[in-house]
Curated annotation (Swiss-Prot):
Its main location: cytoplasm. One of its GO terms (molecular function) is nucleotide binding. InterPro entries: SurE, SurE-like_Pase/nucleotidase, SurE-like_sf. This is 5'-nucleotidase SurE. Its EC number is 3.1.3.5.
Length: 261
């Protein structure tokens, strides 16, 4: 099996090393793991692409590349340049340092990489490690992802719930904020929304009097709807959410059509 991996934390991020281990085991003997990851931190860039400027790419080693662009840029670089058009069997993005459940999924560069893979017609999975108090003193904060990642990916590949008409399906996997031994299981889940979940900006003045705005997030350990990815993660479960890039609110179409008549 040929696997392309990327992330949004950057080429030197420890989560990418974990993902490379997961990918190598999935690929198996004789398989190939190709890495194309951002040269610099790209957290929060979502599904953006470098449309108005070129992306510089550098080879760091065998099948290992860093690109000065977003995760979506990296996926395209892998598909159309690095892998010479020889398509991968699977695209993996992560393992993100921090959760991408709930509203975080909308901002995530990790999901942006997986989404681009799906839009390009490939099987794609995003993997993220929820952080919590257990991680602060852990020798390996990615313990849950490292120990359970291979099994989850294999289950998704075996389920064959891919493709379909229109936008392709990709998967958002979030490992709970516990060590591997504390994981209760794996559950399918819808995307949740934390109560009062809003990003905001706070202003600070530099010594020279210049005004800077810093993005601030909201509390992450806030429960969402029962059974959602957020609530399941906080309860110790790995969540798996099937996703598509289609943003249409289908439940509003009929009423909108009537209002526009």
């Amino acid at each position: 099996m040929r696997i392309l991996i990327t992330n949004d934390d950057g080429i030197n991020a420890p989560g990418l090393e974990v993902l490379a281990e997961i990918a190598a085991e999935i690929a198996g003997p004789g398989g190939e793991v190709w890495t194309v990851a951002p040269a610099f931190e790209q957290s929060g860039v979502g599904h953006c692409i470098s449309y108005t400027q070129p992306t510089m790419i550098a080879e760091l080693g065998p099948r290992r590349y860093a690109a000065e662009g977003s995760p979506a840029d990296c996926v395209m670089a892998g598909l159309y340049d690095v892998m010479n058009g020889d398509a991968p069997d699977l695209i993996l993005s992560g393992v993100n340092r921090g959760n991408n459940s709930g509203e975080n999924a909308l901002y995530s560069g990790t999901l942006g990489g997986a989404m681009e893979g799906a839009l390009q017609g490939h099987k794609a999975i995003a993997l993220s490690q929820y952080y919590g108090p257990a991680m602060a003193t852990a020798d390996d904060p990615f313990d849950a992802a490292r120990r359970h990642g291979v099994a989850v990916v294999r289950k998704l590949l075996a389920a064959d719930q891919w493709g379909g008409p229109g936008y392709g399906t990709f998967y958002n996997v979030n490992f709970p904020p516990v060590l591997a031994a504390g994981v209760k299981g794996v559950r399918a889940a819808p995307q949740g929304l934390r109560s009062h979940a809003r990003f905001r900006v706070e202003a600070q003045l530099s010594p020279s009097g210049r005004r800077f705005l810093w993005v601030q997030g909201s509390a992450q350990n806030v429960p969402a709807e029962q059974g959602s990815d957020v609530s399941l993660n906080l309860d110790g479960y790995i969540s798996v959410t099937p996703m598509r890039a289609d943003l249409t609110a289908y439940d509003k179409l009929a009423d909108l059509e009537a209002a526009l008549a």
